[in-house]
Swiss-Prot record:
Protein name (Swiss-Prot/TrEMBL): Photosystem I iron-sulfur center
Binding site for [4Fe-4S] cluster 1: 11, 14, 17, 58
Keywords: 4Fe-4S, Chloroplast, Electron transport, Iron, Iron-sulfur, Membrane, Metal-binding, Oxidoreductase, Photosynthesis, Photosystem I, Plastid, Repeat, Thylakoid, Transport
Phylogenetic placement of the source organism: Eukaryota, Viridiplantae, Streptophyta, Embryophyta, Tracheophyta
This enzyme's EC code(s): 1.97.1.12
Every 4Fe-4S ferredoxin-type domain range: 2-31, 39-68
Gene: psaC
Naturally occurring in which organism (per UniProt): Chloranthus spicatus
Binding site residues for [4Fe-4S] cluster 2: 21, 48, 51, 54
Length: 81
């Protein structure tokens, strides 16, 4: 099941999220849109298991990486509204 993974321009390019991901969803690429000149897009969101380890690993005050779980997953976890 695919989840939505969003990388924000507050990314500092530290690679912590990339290293924390157990399914290699993230990878670092050059990007001029942030201070670090690199960002971790999520080219393989279909492999995301929704563990949010990337979020936990992010050292920025405003999480630069966010995982939005699909409706089915949030419903099964009892988190749906």
């Amino acid at each position: 099941m695919s989840h939505s993974v969003k990388i924000y321009d507050t990314c500092i390019g530290c690679t912590q999220c990339v290293r924390a991901c157990p399914t290699d969803v993230l990878e670092m690429i050059p990007w001029d849109g942030c201070k670090a000149k690199q960002i971790a897009p999520a080219p393989r969101t279909e492999d995301c298991v929704g563990c949010k380890r990337c979020e936990s690993a992010c050292p920025t005050d405003f999480l630069s990486v966010r995982v939005y779980l699909s409706n089915e997953t949030t419903r099964s976890m009892g988190l749906a509204y």
